[in-house]
Amino acid sequence: DNPDHVGHKEGHDTPAYYHKLEEIDGYIGKVMNAVKEAGILDETIFIITSDHGGINKGHGGKTMQEMETPFIISGKNIKKGHEIQASMMQFDVAATVAAIFKLKQPQVWIGRPIMEVFK
């Protein structure tokens, strides 16, 4: 089960939802430890994000609580402890990943890389 399903079934901002987030946090820790054990931690960038916020059992919406999502980025050439000041949209995530890999964005993309996170 994933946090999205729990949020829609049990509700966002509920004990069940936060329990699921704690479970996911444990999985993230396992991935990070595996990357460290593989000796590639210094060459890795982690991105953790979500596709939408939520109120009650809803799916997105027009309020900030429903539209705002976390965007956590950490790793090689990423500023530590930086808080993004620019407005950011979901389609900027793909543009940021493209910038990490030095890929040219397709002309039709409307996203822009969040350059302020880079050292």
How would you name each of these model-derived features?
Residues 1, 6-9, 61-70:
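Short, flexible, mixed-charge acidic loops at enzyme active sites
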Residues 1-4, 52-55, 77-79:
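Solvent-exposed loop/turn segments at secondary-structure junctions
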Residues 1-23, 30:
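Active-site His/acidic residue clusters
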Residues 14-17, 21-24, 64, 86-90, ...:
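Solvent-exposed, acidic/flexible segments
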Residues 20-63, 97:
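Metal-dependent active-site segment of extracytoplasmic phospho-/sulfohydrolases and closely related
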Residues 29, 53-54, 75, 102, ...:
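Glycine-centered flexibility sites
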Residues 32, 37, 43, 88, ...:
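Secreted, luminal/periplasmic, and some membrane-associated catalytic domains
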Residues 62-104, 115:
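Substrate-binding rim/cap in mid-to-C-terminal beta-strand-loop elements of soluble/periplasmic
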